[in-house]
Amino acid sequence: HQKYNPFRFVELVLVVDKAM
């Protein structure tokens, strides 16, 4: 089941920020 995880979004933002 898919459950929205805000921490997953934060982790994605950190990865994108590090890439840029």
Curated annotation (Swiss-Prot):
Its main location: secreted. Expressed by the venom gland. Its cofactor is Zn(2+). Inhibited by ethylenediaminetetraacetic acid (EDTA) and 1,10-phenanthroline. Not inhibited by tosyl-L-lysine chloromethyl ketone (TCLK) and phenylmethanesulfonylfluoride (PMSF). GO terms for biological process: proteolysis; venom-mediated hemorrhage in another organism. It is an enzyme of class 3 (hydrolase). Its EC number is 3.4.24.-. The keyword Repeat does not apply. GO terms for cellular component: extracellular region. Binds 1 zinc ion per subunit. Keywords: Fibrinogenolytic toxin, Hemorrhagic toxin, Hemostasis impairing toxin, Hydrolase, Metal-binding, Metalloprotease, Protease, Secreted, Toxin, Zinc. Optimum pH is 7-9. It comes from the Eukaryota. Activity is stable between 20-40 degrees Celsius, decreases at higher temperatures and is lost at 70 degrees Celsius. The keyword Metal-binding applies. It is found in: Secreted. One of its GO terms (molecular function) is metal ion binding. Belongs to the venom metalloproteinase (M12B) family. P-III subfamily. Monomer. Snake venom zinc metalloprotease that possesses hemorrhagic activity (minimum hemorrhagic dose, MHD=4.7 ug) when injected intradermally into mice. Degrades the alpha-chain of fibrinogen (FGA). This is Zinc metalloproteinase-disintegrin-like uracoina-1. It comes from Crotalus vegrandis. The lineage of its organism: Eukaryota, Metazoa, Chordata, Craniata, Vertebrata.
